[in-house]
Design a protein with these regions (language model features):
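Alpha-helical subdomain
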Residues: 1-11, 16-17, 112-113, 117-253
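Conserved Class I S-adenosyl-L-methionine-dependent methyltransferase catalytic core
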Residues: 2-116
Length: 253
């Protein structure tokens, strides 16, 4: 068992051999020690792997055919609260890793001018909302998301500092008849719009615009593959898009 694994590792460069002994390479060290590598590999194993068997069918139908390995939902977002515990853990580890690293700079941008009420669209488990209420002692944050996500958010923020200033507005954002709530100084969308088709994203933005007044600011943060500094980052994003197509909703990146 050790021999076949070491020989495979030798071929992919995670171990090296010298004087009939194996030792770890720099790439192997990063696989073991680098948090991003672990987050990505765990995510691929627990969320993506089995469902990717149905990628071709997904491309033909425009539906997340791979999602059936976990349950019968129109998109993965309705099913997040019902995923197997290990899959749910790795989903959120992946999701939080990439959002958490951007919070400090984003907070400075959003709160560069006074914000008393902020609408967090697609706020998921409330990580950004928590950051906002900890950063600013007065801001009230409302999370607009699916009812299932709102339930996860309530559990995640329960008893935490500022949780009394985090509110919920459950809604299916893909329903073009659902209006956005009004009266906000800022609207925040992070790693959100690229989860939908161009038509769906346009509908969301049109309804957001209709809810805004002349003083409302709209902030959108998205990772675009063709705006990356490093080639490897672009590679990772385009490959992750294949997962989103097969597993998330069948038509997104």
């Amino acid at each position: 068992a050790a021999q076949v694994l070491l020989e495979a590792s030798l071929s992919i460069g995670t171990v090296l051999t010298r004087d009939n002994r194996y030792f770890i390479s720099k790439a192997g060290w990063f696989v073991l020690k680098d948090k991003m590598a672990r987050v990505n590999m765990d995510f691929t194993q627990e969320i993506c792997y089995q469902g990717m068997f149905d990628l071709e069918k997904t491309l033909q139908t425009g539906k997340p055919e791979g999602l059936k390995v976990f349950g019968d939902w129109p998109t993965i977002y309705e099913g997040l609260s019902s995923l197997p515990s290990i899959a749910q853990e790795k989903w959120f580890a992946f999701d939080h890793y990439y959002s958490d690293n951007s919070f400090t700079e984003a907070l400075n941008t959003v709160f560069a001018k006074p914000v008393k009420k902020l609408l967090d669209v697609g706020g998921n488990t409330g990580r950004w909302a928590e950051q906002c209420v900890n950063h600013n002692a007065e801001v009230e944050v409302t999370i607009m998301d699916l009812p299932q996500q709102i339930g996860l958010m309530r559990e995640a923020t329960k008893g935490k500092n500022g949780a009394d200033r985090i509110h919920a507005h459950p809604a299916n954002l893909l329903d073009p008849e659902i209006p956005f709530p009004t009266g906000f100084d800022a609207i925040w969308m992070s790693q959100f719009l690229d989860c939908f088709t161009e038509e769906q994203a346009t509908s969301i933005l049109q309804r957001a615009a209709a809810s805004m007044n002349e003083n409302t600011s709209l902030y959108i943060m998205e990772p675009f593959w063709d705006r990356q500094r490093y080639e490897t980052a672009a590679y990772c994003l385009t490959m992750t898009s294949l997962y989103f197509t097969a597993m998330a909703n069948g038509n997104s990146k």
